């Protein structure tokens, strides 16, 4: 019996090659795309789960709250780790601290052959690192590797980069030319699926050597440069531990002498496996993704699969009139309804099986392009995982059942007497159902088109928005505690000798980025008792010229005033609110007190007010900002991390060559590396950019699948109405009349789909845009979005239906009505 069902199914597929191809291709594309999305989602969900104790590892984070600011921080003070060990020994097994010197790049030099590289994935960590995280050592002893000061563990890739085929154990690498570190271990490359990227780790005790001249570097509870992780004991009540963390505020934070009186802190635990998809705090180690986008992608995957199944159901039921006589004859010859059901559902499973195989081939071909688009390294081998093959079998059964159940039930229920007489009205009864399915497809297509357009318009808005400073043709050079910091004026003077280099300045953090620094700067007029943590940017001369910052009152820093380096600050317009003044001019001459963690109060005078600019990313509102000059009598080491060079648009290549030459003359140890500021800022929105590319690609695929179904339906509709078309042409109907007749029904469905999709798209778009403080004028763009998407989907539908409509209209009416 099974052999007979299979033979009939294959024969039916071959007899109707066009419909079979549409069904198989639509399902294959839908399945391949859905599997691709599932692979991406599984990759995102797998972050940090490679640790053997991933269910017991937590990151300790804190939220600082004052009257005018809430700051969610991923980092904590130096001393929090040891305090946690001491305060909660019943809950915590181990703690690990990470510190990156608050620098993006670190230079390591092999003194023997003078090979140096700048590394970004470097941290000082506690010796418990290997006890908490599943970092596998290829060489070295995990219990001893990070025990002593100036010990260094490197990845196997870096071992080859610095030492070639030599054994790296016991060899030295110079850290920034100031300390030699001994390689005590080589670990396997850190997995990609982690919220932290690690290539090198040094012992935390090394900091005592590096900060030997500043013995109190780790005592402040206001300085929060440390990522703190804990391994809770097996069976520990993390809920209870979370609630007990509140006791640390009064006991340690507020007990610190410099703690602002109006500042409160909330400490909480984050499961390490949740960080990548749910955390978006200040000072994250890497740009994280978003669980919202994962849910969106899963919904899109479901939509695509539903689209493909709808196509199958539509085409199967559309052919009901053609197959009704087959059903009638089989029933007259003794066929039972159950047997016919099995035959039709078997055809569905056969189509699905072929589509699965073709879909996997499409998936394998598309995967390299998908990885390039998403910057992933996703692989697919059905034999790598014991669950893959059973999963594909279940998927085949599920899709085959969902896609084929209704057509099988429908076709097997025909009454033989009616269909053999040609009196069956079931074809008409399914019309509403088919139209509903087509409308559903195009509703989702319109939603995807509008959603993709919203993401695209928001990203364009971010890229084009006036940030209040010039980001174009500005080159950023890392300047963190290297020779450039000591020879800054020399480097600047030589750089400016090139005609295409307009200006050079140094600054602590990159404008427009996510990295910020807060210090205790207090307006004097508010009184000694008024505490505040304000955003501070350390700069050198010419910062306003390099970034084209607008001075709206007073003046910028000037070499004509020797006291600027020790006595003067600039503020932005937003800072006026803390000074209780109405105009920028009134702020000039006002006093600002700075209370450093150690040392006496410093007094500064406001010499200028700048127009507000987006110092942080566009996801945040503009905050009060103070610019402090650290050039002149004060060494810039420790304050300036970047050098910004403004280049004339027409001379980029020559200017870069001159910069590289100058760099190597002044600083022969560190490699010359640069980034354009606009490219650097674009990385902040990497997640949104990836989602935009994915949503665009998947929207196109959804529309393609919908069009495949519409193509089949239009073809069958034209075939069913062949005699009607012939009669109409005989009575004088033109080609345009026939095309309009066949297209009208489909265009009505597209119109209904637009009406349904518009309010849904408006709601979803509004919710997504709430993630951005600055966004394009969504309301004003609605007519363009709605009418544009509607027009696009109508053009697509007309193009799809029009081909078969014109083809049907051009048929000789004599041939069309001959059978009548």
Predicted regions and their residues:
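Mid-to-C-terminal secondary-structure elements
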Residues: 125-139, 152-289, 490-687
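Hydrophobic, regular-secondary-structure patches
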Residues: 44, 53, 58-121, 128-131, ...
């Amino acid at each position: 019996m099974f052999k007979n069902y299979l033979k009939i199914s294959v024969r039916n597929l071959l007899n109707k090659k066009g419909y079979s191809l549409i069904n198989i291709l639509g399902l294959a594309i839908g399945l391949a795309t859905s599997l691709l999305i599932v692979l991406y989602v599984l990759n995102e969900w797998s972050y940090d789960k490679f640790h053997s104790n991933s269910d017991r590892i937590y990151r300790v984070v804190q939220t600082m709250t004052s009257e005018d600011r809430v700051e969610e921080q991923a980092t904590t003070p130096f001393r929090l780790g040891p305090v946690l060990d001491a305060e909660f020994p019943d809950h915590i097994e181990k703690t690990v601290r990470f510190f990156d010197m608050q620098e993006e790049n670190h230079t390591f030099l092999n003194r023997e052959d003078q090979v140096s590289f700048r590394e970004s994935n470097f941290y000082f960590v506690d010796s418990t690192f290997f006890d908490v995280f599943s970092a596998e050592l290829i060489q070295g002893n995990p219990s001893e590797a990070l025990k002593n000061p100036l010990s260094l563990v490197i990845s196997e890739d870096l071992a080859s980069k610095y030492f070639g085929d030599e054994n790296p154990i016991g060899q030295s690498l110079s850290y920034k030319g100031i300390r030699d570190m001994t390689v005590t271990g080589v670990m396997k490359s850190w997995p990609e699926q982690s919220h932290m990227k690690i290539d090198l780790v040094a012992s935390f005790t090394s900091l005592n050597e590096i900060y030997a001249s500043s013995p109190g570097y780790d005592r402040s509870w206001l300085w929060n440069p440390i990522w703190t992780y804990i391994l809770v004991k097996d069976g520990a009540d993390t809920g209870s531990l979370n609630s007990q963390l509140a006791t640390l505020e009064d006991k340690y934070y507020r007990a610190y002498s410099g703690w602002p009186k109006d500042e409160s802190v909330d400490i909480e635990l984050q499961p390490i496996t949740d960080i990548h998809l749910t955390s978006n705090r200040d000072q994250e180690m890497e740009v994280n993704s978003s669980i919202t986008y994962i849910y969106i992608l899963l919904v899109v995957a479901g939509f695509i699969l539903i689209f493909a199944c709808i196509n199958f159901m539509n085409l199967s039921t559309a052919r009901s009139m053609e197959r009704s006589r087959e059903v009638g004859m089989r029933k007259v010859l003794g066929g039972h309804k159950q047997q016919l059901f099995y035959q039709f559902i078997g055809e569905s499973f056969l189509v699905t099986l072929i589509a699965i195989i073709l879909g996997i081939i499409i998936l394998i071909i598309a995967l390299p392009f998908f990885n390039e688009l998403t910057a992933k390294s996703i692989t697919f081998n059905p034999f790598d995982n014991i669950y893959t093959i059973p999963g594909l079998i279940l998927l085949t059964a599920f899709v085959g059942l969902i896609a084929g159940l209704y057509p099988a039930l429908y076709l097997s229920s025909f009454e033989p007497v009616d269909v053999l007489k040609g009196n069956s009205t079931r074809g008409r009864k399914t019309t509403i159902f088919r139209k509903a399915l087509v409308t559903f497809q195009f509703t989702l297509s319109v939603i995807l088109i509008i959603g993709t357009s919203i993401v695209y318009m928001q990203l364009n808005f971010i890229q084009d928005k006036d940030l209040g400073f010039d980001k174009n043709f500005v080159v950023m050079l890392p300047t963190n505690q290297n020779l450039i910091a000591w020879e800054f004026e020399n480097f600047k003077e030589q750089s400016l000798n090139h005609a295409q280099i307009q200006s050079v300045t140094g600054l602590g953090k990159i404008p427009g980025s996510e990295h910020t620094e807060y210090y205790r700067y207090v307006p004097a007029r508010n009184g000694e008792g008024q505490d505040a943590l304000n955003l501070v940017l350390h700069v050198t001369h010419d910062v306003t010229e390099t970034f084209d910052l607008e001075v709206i009152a007073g003046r910028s820093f000037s070499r004509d005033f020797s006291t600027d380096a020790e006595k003067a600050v600039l503020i932005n317009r937003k800072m006026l609110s803390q000074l209780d003044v109405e105009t920028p001019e009134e702020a000039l001459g006002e006093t600002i007190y700075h209370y450093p963690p150690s040392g006496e109060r410093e007094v500064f005078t406001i010499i200028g007010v700048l127009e507000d600019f987006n110092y942080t990313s566009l996801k945040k509102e503009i905050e009060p900002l103070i610019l402090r000059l650290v050039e002149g009598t004060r060494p810039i080491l420790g304050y300036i991390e970047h050098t910004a060079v403004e280049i004339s648009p027409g001379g980029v290549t020559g200017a870069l060559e001159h910069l590289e030459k100058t760099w190597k003359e002044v600083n022969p140890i560190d490699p010359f590396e640069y980034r354009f500021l606009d490219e650097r800022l674009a990385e902040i929105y990497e997640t949104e950019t990836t989602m935009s590319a994915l949503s665009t690609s998947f929207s196109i695929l959804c529309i393609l699948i919908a069009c495949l179904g519409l193509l089949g339906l239009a073809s069958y509709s034209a075939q069913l109405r062949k005699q009607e078309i012939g009669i109409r042409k005989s009575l004088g109907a033109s080609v345009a009349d026939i095309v309009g007749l066949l297209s009208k029904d489909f265009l009505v469905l597209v119109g209904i789909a637009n009406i349904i999709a518009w309010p849904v798209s408006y709601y979803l778009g509004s919710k997504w845009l709430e993630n951005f403080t600055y966004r394009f004028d969504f309301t004003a763009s609605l007519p363009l979005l709605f009418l544009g998407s509607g027009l696009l989907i109508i053009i697509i539908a007309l193009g799809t239906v029009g081909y078969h409509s014109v083809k049907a209209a051009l048929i000789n009416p004599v041939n069309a009505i001959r059978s009548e």
